[in-house]
Amino acid sequence: MCLIYAGIKETTEDIVCYKMYVSSFKGKLVSPYMRSPMPNMNEVTKTRLGKPYGIGSCVDEGFHSFATLEDAISESECWTRHYDCDPIIVRCIIPKDSKCYIGSFWGKTAYCSDSIKLIEICA
């Protein structure tokens, strides 16, 4: 997933977001684009946050998520139609004091952050 960068901020409060996962060939849940394993639920997980690059200022390194459940479901429906899979959507929190890019992915408001906490499977 490549976020089209609009701005960066250090979060001053927790941000609720929604992340999609799909089953891998080995039956594990992974992120759909980078195939990163799904972190443990209810634990803050950190990763490297990439820098914007190229035309449109894409950001591909970090935890990508959607601002609304509706946008995450819309993206998961595309995966269901085109890749014959059954994605899950997880409600997450980008914790306070995280670094977070705000931008868009296929016209949907999205985030790319250096940390995330998975809360519950919601769709």
List where the protein language model places each region.
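Conserved NAD+-utilizing ADP-ribose enzyme module
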Residues: M1-F63, A67-A123
